Design a protein with these regions (language model features):
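RNA-binding accessory domains that recognize and position tRNA/RNA substrates
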Residues: 2-181, 185-202, 206-210, 214, ...
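Active-site-proximal beta-strand elements of phosphoester/diester hydrolases
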Residues: 181-186, 296-297, 337-341
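Cysteine-nucleophile active-site neighborhood
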Residues: 218, 223, 227-303, 348-356
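Single conserved hydrophobic/aromatic residue that forms the stacking wall/gate
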Residues: 357-367
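A glycine-centered loop/beta-turn motif at secondary-structure junctions
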Residues: 326-359
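Proline-centered loop/turn at the N-terminus of a beta-strand
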Residues: 113, 181, 252-254, 270, ...
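Catalytic beta-strand/loop cores that center a nucleophilic Ser/Cys/Thr
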Residues: 292-334
Length: 367
């Protein structure tokens, strides 16, 4: 939709009092969330349906969004978990052979409030310099209730994020003629993680976030994967306790994103909130062992403090080339390694997809 199109007004109010005036698309109303930005050029439908964005208002830095539409095949979860959506310009005439609708209709169906025709470059600079902050998108006159909204914004906090996105039921995927059985913890996992494991000959048992060591023993998997997910990792105290016990079962473990953070917390390390996070499909990561840099897809606002890990327990295997933060951990006395980025990257770079070929079974560690 042209940025000059005259449609219903919408407003973005930030915690620092900054107001952006734009136009409404998607649902109408008022929504509060943590305002973040992603630098991905494509994959907006995957962004909108990634549970890791729970409670957040997502800004797309790329200026034109929606030109290939939306379709049923690119969902990363059953629904959208973002609180709100911000773009510079959206396309109302998408063209793609897989297209089944446009992004405005998608947002309306998902009841997501969006705003377009604002200066997303200016907004991104504010977040980059001041850090992520809470904000509100509203289709009402923001100036008439600015003080009331600012109070609500400052009181807003994302809580119980993992509990809000995990499925309480255990589900099984993959063929009966599988080579391995993998227990995938659902902290807010993306479907493509599951699909990549199935494509590699695994039967995938998706288990709830609060699954215990005893329950894992009953499943008897060849490997365990801790998935991505939303929120502050340190608030998941019961999950962290379970992970500590699960790690002692001797079953190979691989963690991604939030799973990487929870595994580190379970083994004595700490996490920190990043100023504006790593969100996008162009994050450079250095593999310390190889001395090579890989381009990765990421979506996280917290990071493991690498130096907080006891060197007798684990060592940092990957670091972010931009800010030097921990991007991977390899454990010494347990059969486990974890990464902060997404090797499955759908859509995004496939530089680190080889990590998914590492066998979940100790019988064949070179696959």
């Amino acid at each position: 939709m042209s940025i000059f199109n005259q449609s219903q007004k919408a407003y973005l109010l930030l915690a620092d009092g900054t107001v952006f005036e734009g136009c409404s698309f998607g649902a109408e109303g008022t929504v509060i969330g943590e305002v973040v930005f992603t630098t991905s050029l494509t994959g907006y439908q995957e962004t909108l349906t990634d549970p890791s964005y729970y409670g957040q208002i997502v800004t797309q830095t790329f200026p034109l969004i929606g030109n290939y539409g939306v379709n049923d095949g690119d969902y990363e979860s059953a629904r959208s978990y973002v609180s709100g959506y911000i773009v510079r310009e959206w396309c109302n005439t998408p063209s793609n052979f897989r297209c089944q609708g446009n992004i405005d209709t998608f947002l309306k169906e998902q009841n997501i409030i969006g705003i377009h025709s604002i200066d997303t470059r200016c907004l991104t600079r504010i977040i980059r310099e001041a850090g992520v902050m809470n904000g509100v998108i509203t289709t009402e006159n923001v100036y008439e209730k600015k003080d009331e909204l600012l109070k609500q914004i400052n009181e807003y906090k994302i809580t119980d994020a993992v509990k809000s996105v995990t499925n309480p039921e255990t589900r099984t995927y993959g063929s009966e003629n599988h080579k391995y059985k993998v227990a995938l913890f659902d902290f807010g996992y993306k479907r493509n993680i599951r699909n990549e494991l199935v494509n590699r000959g695994c039967e995938v048992i998706v288990v709830p976030a609060d699954t215990t060591a005893e329950q894992i023993k009953e499943i008897a998997p060849d490997g365990i994967m801790f998935s991505n997910g939303p929120g502050d990792p340190s608030e998941n105290t019961e999950v962290i306790k379970n992970i500590r016990e699960i790690a002692q079962l001797g079953i190979p473990i691989f963690g991604i994103c939030l799973g990487h953070q929870l595994m580190a917390l379970a083994h004595g390390a700490t996490t920190q909130k990043l100023k504006y996070g790593h969100r996008g499909a162009n994050q450079p990561v250095i593999d310390k062992a190889l001395g090579k840099t890989f381009v990765t897809s990421q979506n996280h606002g917290y990071a493991v403090v690498g130096e907080s890990m006891d060197p007798e327990i684990g060592e940092v295997s990957h670091i972010n080339a931009n800010d030097g933060t921990c991007e991977g951990m390899r454990y010494k006395n347990i059969n486990a390694f974890t990464v902060q980025f997404h090797p499955e990257a759908h859509g995004g770079p496939q530089d680190t997809a080889c990590l998914l070929y590492t066998s979940p079974s100790p019988r064949d560690r070179t696959r």
